[in-house]
Every structure is written in C-alpha cells, then in structure tokens.
C-alpha cells in the first residue's frame, strides 16, 4: 500500500503495465511527481524466489517488476491477475474466456478500475489520475468528482 506521500501528484493506474507506463512512472519518480502507481502485480522477488520459479513463470513475473519505482509508491491488487495467469497455464480456458470469463482480462480490468476508484479519495486526494481505456471508467468518474 502506498504512503500517499505526494497527495497532489500523479496517480498512474494500469493493471498489466507496459513500456510506456514504465517510462512515464520513471519520469514522474525522477521529478518527484508520482503520488502512486496502481497495478495488479508488483513483483519484487528476493534471490531465492528468482531461483525457484520455472523460466516461463519467472519471465512473466519479471515483466511485472518495477524496481525503478519505490515500493512505498506502488499499490497492487495481485490475486485475480495471478489467478488468471495460473488458469491460463493449467488450461482452465473457460475462466479466461475473452469478455465473459470470471478471470478474463476484461473482468480483471473492471475489478482493477473499481479498486483504483475506491482508493482515490483516501489515498491521493485532489491529484491527477492517468489511467488506461478498459480500466479507467470508474477511476475517471471518481477523479472528476474529486476535482
């Protein structure tokens, strides 16, 4: 959970992370403007964890690693996304079916969006919110209400 140190800064929300988000958050951290980065998985393994995971799982988790962002500025909601990754690996395709599966990317994004929206009033206050398409409707609605 974030400390919300910069309550007037920028909240960046992206459930899965991507290269642009990495560059954006890195720049905001460098300028002292990142209030919080919200994502599903923030992988911060120790050396033992790196050795124990099979190569494919380790590579997937490393994509969810944000070492350039202080842990105090990251809020994560890992359970559903982690379960989606597991379901995909063990062949439970009904759970991950596009748009309709309980663990589909669409369902993960909707859940993530509602979670970020609930965090805004208490954690961030009147800062700026930067979020993405399918995971932003509720977040933007709350952000607009907060001003």
Whereabouts are the PLM-identified features?
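N-terminal subdomain of nucleotide-sugar transferases
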Residues: 1-73, 117-125
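Residue-identity detector for threonine
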Residues: 3, 25, 39, 96, ...
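An aromatic- and histidine-rich active-site surface loop
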Residues: 18-22, 43-46, 51, 105-117, ...
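Phenylalanine-focused residue identity feature
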Residues: 20, 37, 66, 79-82, ...
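Conserved nucleotide-sugar donor-binding subdomain of glycosyltransferases
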Residues: 77-128
């Amino acid at each position: 959970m974030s400390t919300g140190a910069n309550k007037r800064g920028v909240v960046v929300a992206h459930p899965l992370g991507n290269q642009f988000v990495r560059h954006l958050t890195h720049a905001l951290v460098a300028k002292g403007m990142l209030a919080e980065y919200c994502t599903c998985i923030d992988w911060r393994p120790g050396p033992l964890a790196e050795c124990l995971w099979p190569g494919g799982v380790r590579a997937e988790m490393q994509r969810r690693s944000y070492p350039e962002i202080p842990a105090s500025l990251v809020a994560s909601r890992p359970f559903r996304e982690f379960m989606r990754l597991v379901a995909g690996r063990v062949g439970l395709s009904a759970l991950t079916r596009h748009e309709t599966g309980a663990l589909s990317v669409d369902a993960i994004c909707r859940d993530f969006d509602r979670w970020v929206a609930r965090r805004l009033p208490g954690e961030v206050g009147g800062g700026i919110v930067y979020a993405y398409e399918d995971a932003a409707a509720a977040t933007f609605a709350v952000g607009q209400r907060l001003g």
